[in-house]
Amino acid sequence: MARIPRCDFLGLPGICYLLSFLLAGLLLPRASAFNLDVMGAIRKEGEPGSLFGFSVALHRQLQPRPQSWLLVGAPQALALPGQQANRTGGLFACPLSLEETDCYRVDIDRGANVQKESKENQWLGVSVRSQGAGGKVVTCAHRYESRQRVDQVLETRDVIGRCFVLSQDLAIRDELDGGEWKFCEGRPQGHEQFGFCQQGTAATFSPDSHYLIFGAPGTYNWKGLLFVTNIDSSDPDQLVYKTLDPADRLTGPAGDLTLNSYLGFSIDSGKGLMRSEELSFVAGAPRANHKGAVVILRKDSASRLIPEVVLSGERLTSGFGYSLAVTDLNSDGWADLIVGAPYFFERQEELGGAVYVYMNQGGHWADISPLRLCGSPDSMFGISLAVLGDLNQDGFPDIAVGAPFDGDGKVFIYHGSSLGVVTKPSQVLEGEAVGIKSFGYSLSGGLDVDGNHYPDLLVGSLADTAALFRARPVLHVSQEIFIDPRAIDLEQPNCADGRLVCVHVKVCFSYVAVPSSYSPIVVLDYVLDGDTDRRLRGQAPRVTFPGRGPDDLKHQSSGTVSLKHQHDRVCGDTVFQLQENVKDKLRAIVVTLSYGLQTPRLRRQAPDQGLPLVAPILNAHQPSTQRTEIHFLKQGCGDDKICQSNLQLAQAQFCSRISDTEFQALPMDLDGTALFALSGQPFIGLELTVTNLPSDPARPQADGDDAHEAQLLATLPASLRYSGVRTLDSVEKPLCLSNENASHVECELGNPMKRGTQVTFYLILSTSGITIETTELKVELLLATISEQDLHPVSVRAHVFIELPLSISGVATPQQLFFSGKVKGESAMRSERDVGSKVKYEVTVSNQGQSLNTLGSAFLNIMWPHEIANGKWLLYPMRVELEGGQGPEKKGICSPRPNILHLDVDSRDRRRRELGQPEPQEPPEKVEPSTSWWPVSSAEKRNVTLDCAQGTAKCVVFSCPLYSFDRAAVLHVWGRLWNSTFLEEYMSVKSLEVIVRANITVKSSIKNLLLRDASTVIPVMVYLDPVAVVAEGVPWWVILLAVLAGLLVLALLVLLLWKLGFFKRAKHPEATVPQYHAVKILREDRQQFKEEKTGTIQRSNWGNSQWEGSDAHPILAADWHPELGPDGHPVSVTA
């Protein structure tokens, strides 16, 4: 059952009773269906496993006696005796009866010659079509197999297919109908020719009943082929037409199709497709170019079918052209085209299956943009199509679309109109309601089989069951309400008791239907409800119906009218009276008339009693309720009794809602328009101030009178919905009511709004409808009153911009890097450790709003300084990983790829990543002395910044798509400082600052998208390693120059000293040197021994030495040597 609208949009207690009465009692049956009778559906069942219902057709024979048939194909039905096969398939004919198992098998295709053919799995009944009332019937077996040289070495088997054409009484008359049709027999064999043509996959008749059309999608390597032949023996055109051979391919967009296109999988024809009153043929090729195509063809004088237009599908593997139908949906004289694509899917919008409606523009198809109808996921929506004829007799054809895997299966009914197809289905038939699964796999309509002048619908399935849905006649009811008196004067009681005021209400009904001969007795039940709007506000009604029925409420009166035939006008009347002491004398009394068709109780009917007549139904497109208002006589309008009010909208501006009683005006743009930021605000306020003051204080009587029934009407855009009303003072707030979808608001400002009154209030508007495409909020405001005043609408606008709540930050680890070692060329690099110090950058993007995939394509970009200005390496990128930007537990792929030199990754890092361990700080490597030997003073050193923004470095941009993330995404970048570049270029630099920049960019079609704080700068300081400043490896020529320079300096110094006389020796007079001889002194006679004995040590006084002459030398103990005697012993010496 279709969903019924909820009744809680106002949230007041008095709503539910009336709406539940109206909807449940009157509108509920009409909301669930229109004029196809579901309760009286006729089921037919076949043999289990026979695929009874794979194809269906409505048929009506006129001779020898009129009878309607439900033709059902069962391509897996068991074989007949003599067919020498297990399953051959068959065609079944079912009468219109309540019996479910009274179908019989049409007597065709008996016997078999196994030397020439095989009927095993020939799938007879795969397609079945009828010409209509009194016409022929065609059914096919597309897997029929022709054999030659059976049981021989050169035996051949060709799956050519075949069809049978039956007379209107389902008998085969070869002399009239041709009987068995095998177009591919006797033609060249092989799958590249006609050996697998599968004639009869689709078969149909032209609408003028002259031509029979067969589809053979297996011909020419499954390119496909169409055969068209005339079955009208009186027609002089008895040629057989077929589509072009592969060798006859035409040029241009309307050329022939490629192989494996399956041309002829679906076929139809119609007049007015290309030229008025000219017959064209249409064929589907669901595998053409992997998207599918539909070809419109014409026949020429050379028995060929020439393609004129090719319509291509929009999605790969959508099966565009799997089914098709031709009809004039808008009745403009030009045939329109409906194409099914059951394999179409849209993952984001959760759509599955599609039907494309091409509205013919006078035979021009090039610039037509088709309307696309879609089903639910995996429903196979569009696998079957049927033209129903004018189902509701409104002058426009209707169509049916099958979706066999939408639940138990559904069939969607779409009405035609002057503008084309109505996109909202008028009725949805569900397989669950009739107990059939895979309901809607095949469809047939457009023929009235029960004789009520309304076309019916036959629905097949894959569950060996079919069901007939008969159309119910549609009644168009006219109703009128007469009120007396039209205005209520509370000062003039007119009831019989003379105390109260009474109002007479008269209602009249009549109906018309199609055809004019259809005139059943129609019984209508109606209900008059008094003071409807007041009760919707939760207030007690002011009226009662004295003559109400026993089951009626006091404010309601019900009745029944019986219309005997079309145009019969029958009336009913009643009286309501106003209650005593009515206080609300300003608001009008609303009387609502609701009516419905009285449906007789369904009685169970025996199967042999024939079909019961289907009951009529009211037109679902015609409202079954009517309102009328009864006003009070107005008072207080001055001496002239003419109310000339002066309602003015003094203030109208958008405000942000801070609390329930606090509002703040939105900021203004340069042009004075309010600015609204879409950043999670669920509501927005609209401040309104309405005054009723005299326009000229000097002439206060000229205007400014009471404004009776003063109202403010607000029309909201689709992005805003009414939520409530607030006031800041203690005065009574206006009563505001909205329509069902809260897009139109009516606020009562007073009845009357007194002279000198000023009302300020806030409309609370929900912003849930604001989307990313919304650029402006525009509310149309109109003051209304029944007093004399000329009022014009006023517009309030606000610009909408979307501020992305994104923040980005970054950090480098470590934040200081050092360089040292030896200079290595790029070709010498083998591992990442050869490059230099490792650094890791971590960039975090936080998202506090909705997922980015709803706004556009977002990218996280990092500007990586990979080279200095002269092209030498700076930071070598090793690895880039994005976490969180692709969804939970997914890693994104950034471009371009890092590590373009394909250096080996440090095995320790690879092991940690495989184990998922955190990355530790890299241990310091063994410091190698720098190869630089020339010392640089600290005063000469300088600070350098390497930044791509300043032109001191060259950057490569790594771009990482952020498809969706809820809270945060983290980008990890690992790199290596190129040690050699710094040794060669920056030895004289005190420090270097390497700048890495990151930002977020959004590619979106949204013009009002604002992105702030979307960039960050990550610096890293680089220094020369102080431990490594040691000179080594001095070149030999430097050593040679240093030696030579030293020798030269030494020579100059010696020459200078020689010139100054430094090398001249001083001359002294010749002196007598005393001679000493060694003597032996006994130990006990030595002075030292004596001193040691006595304990007194006397040291020599080296300062009082004795000199002999002026040139004498002091006598030192160190100069003394003992003189040896003849025996070798020291001798004593006397001075």
Swiss-Prot record:
Stretches in topological domain Extracellular: 34-1036
UniProt keywords, alphabetically: ADP-ribosylation, Calcium, Cell adhesion, Cell shape, Cleavage on pair of basic residues, Disulfide bond, Glycoprotein, Integrin, Membrane, Metal-binding, Receptor, Repeat, Signal, Transmembrane, Transmembrane helix
Domain of life: Eukaryota
Any GO CC annotation of this UniProt entry: sarcolemma
Location of region: Disordered: 905-933
Pfam families: FG-GAP, Integrin_A_Ig_1, Integrin_A_Ig_2, Integrin_A_Ig_3
Signal sequence annotation: 1-33
Binding residue positions for Ca(2+) 3: 448, 450, 452, 454, 456
Locations listed in the record: Membrane
Sequence repeats mapped onto the chain: 1111-1114, 1119-1122, 1127-1130
Region entry 3 X 4 AA repeats of D-X-H-P, spans: 1111-1130
One of the GO BP terms on file: cell-cell adhesion
Ranges that cross the membrane: 1037-1057
Binding site for Ca(2+) 1: 328, 330, 332, 336
Biased composition (Basic and acidic residues): 905-916
Cystine pairings recorded for this chain: 94-103, 140-163, 184-197, 495-502, 508-571, 637-643, 736-747, 894-948, 955-960
Entry membrane topology: Single-pass type I membrane protein
Site (Cleavage): 603-604
Family the UniProt entry places it in: Belongs to the integrin alpha chain family.
Record's function text: Integrin alpha-7/beta-1 is the primary laminin receptor on skeletal myoblasts and adult myofibers. During myogenic differentiation, it may induce changes in the shape and mobility of myoblasts, and facilitate their localization at laminin-rich sites of secondary fiber formation. Involved in the maintenance of the myofibers cytoarchitecture as well as for their anchorage, viability and functional integrity. Required to promote contractile phenotype acquisition in differentiated airway smooth muscle (ASM) cells. Acts as a Schwann cell receptor for laminin-2.
Quaternary structure (record): Interacts (via C-terminus intracellular tail region) with CIB1; the interaction is stabilized/increased in a calcium- and magnesium-dependent manner. Heterodimer of an alpha and a beta subunit. The alpha subunit is composed of a heavy and a light chain linked by a disulfide bond. Alpha-7 associates with beta-1. Interacts with COMP.
Name of this protein: Integrin alpha-7
Organism annotation: Rattus norvegicus (Rat)
